[in-house]
Curated annotation (Swiss-Prot):
Protein name from the UniProt record: Stearoyl-CoA desaturase
Residue spans, topological domain Lumenal: 94-97, 238-241
GO MF term (any one): oxidoreductase activity
Source species: Bos taurus (Bovine)
Reaction(s) the record says it catalyses: octadecanoyl-CoA + 2 Fe(II)-[cytochrome b5] + O2 + 2 H(+) = (9Z)-octadecenoyl-CoA + 2 Fe(III)-[cytochrome b5] + 2 H2O; hexadecanoyl-CoA + 2 Fe(II)-[cytochrome b5] + O2 + 2 H(+) = (9Z)-hexadecenoyl-CoA + 2 Fe(III)-[cytochrome b5] + 2 H2O
Comment field on protein domains: The histidine box domains are involved in binding the catalytic metal ions.
GO BP terms in the entry: monounsaturated fatty acid biosynthetic process; response to fatty acid; unsaturated fatty acid biosynthetic process
Length: 359
């Protein structure tokens, strides 16, 4: 079956995709509590339980001197050691066994999906719903990735969207490439991040037992799934050297996953084009999408954060959307939310680059 036909088949099978259209109704729910497919204003979406990932243009940075940077030396030392170990791991690549390459790819993809399909599109934005087996899979992948637990990751990400490019944005790209890439993890949070972050509604995350279970046991979970397991499996099962297992399969793989995610915060906010909203910093960056499983269509994502594809195009350089659609085909994902073509074209005309031809 041709790829585009397969995509249509999977996208329409077993579950519904809610289409967001435009304009002009503000009705979000019917009497039975189900989401309606009614036209909405472009700035609105149909997630009545989720409003805190929508950009708030009324928030402005406070005037006056900026607070002094407070370095977190523990993080600086640990990140430096991690990247030194990862660099050494690169030199070991030619000496690794084929099963180790496969293991690293498997572990990388599991961790990536735990971030992209899990912490990002499911828990931060509620762009689709997942049944328990899929949620467990994504929680495990998220723990393997070790980029903060789902609760903290989602809280920071919602703040990033709502207060984007301000002092309340945890990785504000206006503070430079290095800060938005990794520097924000090496210093104390700006007071505005804590102040505005505390105003976010996180009740949906607190109410989810699986998310809170992961948060409660996150440290031992990370120790086991991010460091011990990926090191011991190659060493024990196919007699890989301990050196290769530690520095390549574990430290290099972990550092690679971190930096690819960080590029969404840094490169995808600085380099690329802005077809959907030229008034905001996030850009469409194909190279970032290649590494980050489809997360580089960032101008679209910040314009329509409620679209489960995080892109106008579902499977185009977007492994995460392919994965979610496959999960929908077997009944594990449902209620995927997708912005309509009419809404996209209207938004391009209003705030985007009119020379851009929507596909």
């Amino acid at each position: 079956m041709p790829a585009h036909l397969l995509q249509e088949e999977i996208s329409s099978s077993y579950t519904t995709t809610t289409t967001i259209t435009a304009p002009p109704s503000r009705v979000l729910q019917n009497g039975g509590g189900k989401l309606e497919k009614t036209p909405l204003y472009l700035e609105e979406d149909i997630r009545p339980e989720m409003r805190d990932d929508i950009y708030d243009p009324t928030y402005q940075d406070k005037e006056g001197p900026k607070p002094k940077l407070e370095y977190v030396w523990r993080n600086i030392i640990l990140m430096s050691l991690l990247h030194l170990g990862a660099l050494y791991g690169i030199t070991l690549i030619p000496t690794c066994k084929i099963y180790t390459y496969i293991w690293v790819l498997f572990y990388y993809l599991m961790g990536a999906l735990g971030i992209t399909a899990g912490a990002h599109r499911l828990w931060s934005h509620r762009t689709y719903k997942a049944r328990l087996p899929l949620r467990v899979f994504l929680i495990i992948g998220n723990t393997m990735a070790f980029q903060n637990d789902v609760f903290e990751w989602s809280r920071d990400h919602r703040a990033h969207h709502k207060f984007s490019e301000t002092d309340a944005d945890p990785h504000n790209s206006r503070r430079g490439f290095f800060f938005s890439h990794v520097g924000w993890l090496l210093v104390r949070k700006h007071p505005a991040v804590k102040e505005k972050g505390s105003t976010l509604n996180l009740s949906d995350l607190r109410a989810e037992k699986l998310v809170m279970f992961q948060r409660r046991y996150y440290k031992p979970g990370v120790l086991l799934l991010c460091f011990i397991l990926p090191t011991l499996v190659p060493w024990y099962l196919w007699d890989e050297t301990f050196q290769n297992s530690l520095f390549f399969a574990t430290l290099f793989r972990y550092a690679l996953g971190l930096n690819v995610t960080w590029l969404v915060n840094s490169a995808a906010h600085m380099y690329g084009y802005r077809p959907y909203d030229k008034t905001i910093n996030p850009r469409e960056n194909i190279l970032v999408s290649l590494g980050a499983a489809g997360e580089g269509f960032h101008n679209y994502h910040h314009t329509f954060p409620y679209d489960y594809s995080a892109s106008e195009y579902r499977w185009h350089i977007n492994f995460t959307t392919f994965f979610i659609d496959c999960m929908a085909a077997i009944g594990l994902a449902y209620d995927r939310k997708k912005v309509s073509k009419a809404a996209i074209l209207a938004r391009i005309k209003r705030t985007g680059e009119e020379s851009y031809k929507s596909g």
